Swiss-Prot record:
PROSITE patterns documented for this protein: BRIX
Organism: Pyrococcus furiosus (strain ATCC 43587 / DSM 3638 / JCM 8422 / Vc1)
Main function: Probably involved in the biogenesis of the ribosome.
Gene3D superfamilies documented for this protein: Probable brix-domain ribosomal biogenesis protein
NCBIfam families documented for this protein: PRK03972.1
Protein name as it appears in the record: Probable Brix domain-containing ribosomal biogenesis protein
Keyword line: Ribosome biogenesis
Brix domain span: 1-196
UniProt record, GO biological process: rRNA processing
Domain of life per record: Archaea
GO MF entries: rRNA binding
SUPFAM superfamilies associated with the record: Class II aaRS ABD-related
Record bears the keyword Flavoprotein: no
Keyword ATP-binding: no
Length: 223
């Protein structure tokens, strides 16, 4: 599915976040960044058969941004960015030591049952960024969806006062509650121009980002 790493000099919390994502993205791997460049990471991801490279960018000790990159030896490119309000790690949700999923199964992306069009649009975007499968929720239970698509892991887009959140369920662990990590998204930007900002959604005027501004200008956060 994807190779997961961080910007240079990550904090312990950001590394823990990367390991948590490895446990909910099927057949994915968290890799310590070290001194590797973007090009070296892309080649490693390609050699391992991954379609995506995910870089977790840090700001003031916490994960600030998730950068998704298409993996291809000749046609790689930035796909999109999630700007975060905050995260909650698996251990903070009562789950420690979960095993990564080392078998082929889809990451199903859906929504809570009563959400707006913004949440549905983001669920489709998140599926695109992760190579997951978007499934409209309707009145279906998560167990029904998991059984139908033969998977143990579902990402659910839910409401939040400051944006929206991604909650991960591992039905092989528990069918009663999410295992984490919980990701609070305040802005998402796609390279093709699609975007969403929770302040704009609330009618708060904010400076408009120019095309390509989603990419970091500093070498530490870009790389």
């Amino acid at each position: 599915m994807m190779l997961i790493t961080t910007s240079h000099r990550p904090t312990r919390r950001t590394r823990s976040f990367g390991h948590d994502l490895e446990r909910v993205f099927p057949n994915s791997l968290y890799l310590t960044r070290g001194k590797k460049t973007i090009q070296e990471l892309l080649m490693e991801a390609y050699d391992r058969g991954y379609e995506r490279l995910l870089i977790l960018n840090v700001w003031k000790g916490n994960p600030l941004k998730m950068t998704f990159i298409k993996v291809h030896p000749e046609d790689w490119g930035y796909l999109g960015y999630l700007y975060l309000h905050g995260i909650k790690l698996q251990r903070e949700m009562g789950f420690k030591g979960l095993n990564p999923i080392r078998e082929d199964m889809p990451l199903v992306v859906t929504t809570a049952k009563r959400v707006g069009w913004d949440h549905i649009a983001f669920a489709q975007v998140f599926a695109e960024l992760t190579t997951g499968k978007f499934v409209p929720r309707g009145d279906k239970s998560l167990t029904y969806i998991a059984d139908k698509y033969d998977t143990d892991v579902i990402a659910v887009i839910e409401r939040h006062p400051r944006g929206m959140v991604i909650n991960f369920y591992r039905l092989d662990v528990t069918k009663d509650r999410p295992v984490g990590p919980l990701i609070n998204v305040k802005i998402w930007i796609m390279e093709d121009g699609r975007r969403w900002d929770y302040k704009e959604a609330l009618g708060i005027k904010v400076p408009r980002r120019e095309k390509g501004e989603g990419q970091e200008s500093s070498s530490e956060n870009r790389d």
